[in-house]
Curated annotation (Swiss-Prot):
One of its GO terms (cellular component) is cytosolic large ribosomal subunit. This is Large ribosomal subunit protein uL15. Part of the 50S ribosomal subunit. The lineage of its organism: Bacteria, Pseudomonadati, Pseudomonadota, Alphaproteobacteria, Hyphomicrobiales. PROSITE patterns: RIBOSOMAL_L15 (PS00475). Binds to the 23S rRNA. One of its GO terms (molecular function) is structural constituent of ribosome.
Length: 156
């Protein structure tokens, strides 16, 4: 079998309905669009218009705002850190921080810092220097004999 032998299953692809091709076709002249009016013309879709009814975006109240000072963190689980150590991508003896995790390929695009979560197990004794960590993650790191350095404000 070759690529040029491949065919669609019969009946799986319907032929396009060609409209406006003469009155004998059944869909000639107005092409199933009715007579005159906005919807019979081209480029009709009026986004958000609900036929005169008060549209949903005006029925619902405006809410909230976007905090321009909000910080976005890269979330990394302890299991992923351990997997990177096992694969030889991360050095357990060196300090684990944003740069080392990025170099190891654990995170792709660096944001405002790294936040460590407790998913998975940590066997290695590792020193972390990160922007944040969950309480459970801190407990697991200390239980494994490691240490964690957090900014004072981020300590939870």
């Amino acid at each position: 079998m070759k690529l040029n032998d491949l065919r669609d299953k019969p009946g799986s692809v319907k032929a396009r309905k060609r409209v406006g091709r003469g009155i004998g076709s059944g869909t000639g002249k107005t092409g199933g669009r009715g007579v005159k009016g906005q919807k019979s013309r081209s480029g009709v879709a009026i986004n958000g218009f609900e036929g005169g009814q008060m549209p949903i975006y005006r029925r619902l109240p405006k809410r909230g705002f976007t905090n321009i000072f909000a910080k976005s963190f890269n979330v990394v689980s302890l299991g992923r850190v351990q997997a990177a150590i096992d694969a030889g991508k991360l050095d357990a003896k060196a300090v684990v921080n944003l740069d080392s995790l990025k170099a190891a390929g654990v995170i792709r695009r660096a944001k405002d810092g790294v936040r460590i979560l407790s998913d998975g197990e940590l066997k290695a004794k590792v020193a972390f220097e990160v922007a944040g960590a969950s309480k459970a993650a801190v407990e697991k790191i200390e239980k494994a004999g490691g240490s964690i350095k957090l900014p004072e404000a981020a300590a939870e």
